[in-house]
Amino acid sequence: MKKKNFGVRKDINRGKYCFLIIVDKWSIELQKEEFSLLYKLLITIDQQFSSIKKNLLDDELINLEIEQLPWYAELDGKKDDWNLRLVFESEEETRSFEMYWPIPIAKKLFYEIKKVWESMD
């Protein structure tokens, strides 16, 4: 059985950077507001993708790009298999990074982020 090589962690007691996204051999810490904005961006891209998904053929390629500052997202792939590229640039321009989630984990990581954020209510 292959070990899961990604995840999302939340620890509000950690202070400023209380969210952690882990993929393979890297991780990134996010502030609560950054994570909230990421969640909102992912919901937006999911809604747009869902609205056109039913019209796609199984092997038809799709590319969606959405910018909701400080995030930029690009979904690329097919109806049921897609990857996701995310770019973050802080409003203060003090830090920036790019994340790439390949096809095997993009969808799963998206739902983990959604689950973690929605569990905070």
Located regions from the model:
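Positively charged, low-complexity terminal tracts
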Residues: M1-D121
